[in-house]
Amino acid sequence: MISVRRGFSQLWYWGKRGVIGIIALWMAGILIFAFLPVPFSMVMIERQLGAWLTGDFAYVAHSDWVPMDEISPYMALAVMAAEDQKFPDHWGFDVGAIESALSHNQRNQKRIRGASTLSQQTAKNVFLWDGRSWVRKGLEVGLTAGIELIWTKRRILTVYLNIAEFGNGIFGVEAAARHFFNKPASKLSASEAALLAAVLPNPLRFKVNAPSGYVISRQQWILRQMHQLGGKTFLQENTLD
């Protein structure tokens, strides 16, 4: 009996230390990535390991980090128009969007709607595994609060654009621009930026190089939203250019 208690005690001791260690690593990551390029994300690691485990050794999760100054302003505008139009104003969470999503999901459980902001998407893509669970969501809330506290909005947007998945093995806007349009991210047009943003809900299902009718329709909607937000002036007014 004593040995069993001792075993549980040791398990609790090392488990607690492990959790503290992981939290410390996350905190260090938030501080380091406030200034340095993010070399890879948890999503990239998950995709790469998944490919290897299924025998796809040709798969390479590819990303090329570029600063915001080397990204077309249309791209930053497009992702905000598509994913999070209140990004400059909220503190990491869009309460109105969350309430709307909860109401929708209660009425229609077959088509679940999300309400993640760009800040939340950045936090979970960099630091967390893919999937849906209350544990993961709780960790996402804490990490989102952390990056909102330490990083500027411009930094969050920069990291997001450099780690977002735009296709199979294609991460970050620089890799996407060169793969799909044979040009650097700095040269993307409004239409090209809107097309890239249009596939973000599910880049493994929706294709930039073979857009479905839905993707084209979403691209046109994003272009209209970019105009309604105020175009490049919107970025300048919120110090995001």
UniProtKB/Swiss-Prot annotation:
One of its GO terms (molecular function) is pentosyltransferase activity. It is a single-pass membrane protein. It is found in: Cell inner membrane. It is an enzyme of class 2 (transferase). Peptidoglycan polymerase that catalyzes glycan chain elongation from lipid-linked precursors. PANTHER family: BIOSYNTHETIC PEPTIDOGLYCAN TRANSGLYCOSYLASE, MONOFUNCTIONAL BIOSYNTHETIC PEPTIDOGLYCAN TRANSGLYCOSYLASE. This is Biosynthetic peptidoglycan transglycosylase. It comes from Yersinia pestis.
